[in-house]
Structures are given as C-alpha cells and as structure tokens.
C-alpha cells in the first residue's frame, strides 16, 4: 500500500500521487481479505505478520477494529517502537477504535527478538486496554504477540488478563 507510484512525468519528478479514492479501494480489499483469516488466533497472527509486520526490526502495534460479528472493519499501525520496546498509547488505540465505530478490537504486536513470550509491560498494557475498553463499551477480543517462525502468543488462548474465549 503506497501513496506514491513511480512513473515518468512531464515535470521530471518521476512520481504521481494516487487519489484518495484509489487508496480506499486498496484498504477495502485489505480489510476484506483479513475478514476471511480472523477465524483463529493462529490464522490472524500469520496474516498480520505476513501483510503488516513482515520482518520489521522494530516493535509495531497494530489495532484491528471489528464489528459486532468480529469481522475486521479497519486496520491501523498505532505505534512504532524500537528493537525491544514500544510505548503503545491506550489513547491512540481507542481513538482509532472510536473513529472506525469499532465494537471490538484485536491488538497485535511483534517481538523482533523472535520470542513471543509476553513481558510484564505487555500484560499490564493488555489489562489496561481491557479496562478502558470496558468503560468505552469496546471489547478486547485478543492481544496477540508475534514472534518468529510462526511463533505467537495469544492472551485469549492462554486466558490471561487481556483475553478469554468468551471475550470477558
């Protein structure tokens, strides 16, 4: 998803801006594709790793905003960090959720070191996101940490502070 395409222009700049309408089509296809792959934490983690986080050498936090059926309606990278930490603002997470009219969110972030084991800070952040979400009536369906070689950690699958199978 890029905003600039290289082409030969009369002014010699070599760049053409894509109209915002064109970008919306790309975002819609992106979200539509993700809807098919959110069935399990593993599939969702694989999709986000492959299409958004890739092999980033920095921690990224991604919010997937969902409708009442758990289908993705909006995706955003809400924070970019360093090689071993990322300060994800709960305000930024919920700003994206509110603007997109999300009923639920799924958080993803990567550990560039490859080990998806959550840190105490990861657990604290997940708990705080769940608590703020309860106040705003926006559920946290899961928080998934992506490691390397397909390794991931799902708070929901592990019934830890941020997630449980019933969303409570």
Feature names for model-found ranges:
Residues 36, 44-86:
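Mobile, glycine- and charge-enriched loop segments
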Residues 2-26, 34, 67-69, 79, ...:
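Active-site-proximal loop/helix of nucleotide/amide-processing enzymes and allied scaffolds
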Residues 16-54:
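Solvent-exposed, charged helical/coil patches
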């Amino acid at each position: 998803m890029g905003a600039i395409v290289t082409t030969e222009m009369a002014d010699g700049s070599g760049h053409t801006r894509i109209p915002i309408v064109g970008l919306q089509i790309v975002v819609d296809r992106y979200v539509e594709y993700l809807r098919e792959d959110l069935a399990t934490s593993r599939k969702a983690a694989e999709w986000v790793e492959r299409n958004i986080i890739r092999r980033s050498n920095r921690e990224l936090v991604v919010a997937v905003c969902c409708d009442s059926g758990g289908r993705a309606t909006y995706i955003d990278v809400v924070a970019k960090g360093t090689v071993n930490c990322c300060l994800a603002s709960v305000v930024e997470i919920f700003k994206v959720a509110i603007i997109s009219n999300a009923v639920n969110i799924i958080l993803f972030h990567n550990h560039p070191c490859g080990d998806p084991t959550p840190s105490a800070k990861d657990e604290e952040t997940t708990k705080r996101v769940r608590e703020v979400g309860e106040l705003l009536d926006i559920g946290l369906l899961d928080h998934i940490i992506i490691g390397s070689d397909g390794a991931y950690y799902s708070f929901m699958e592990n019934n830890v502070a941020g997630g449980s199978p019933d969303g409570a």
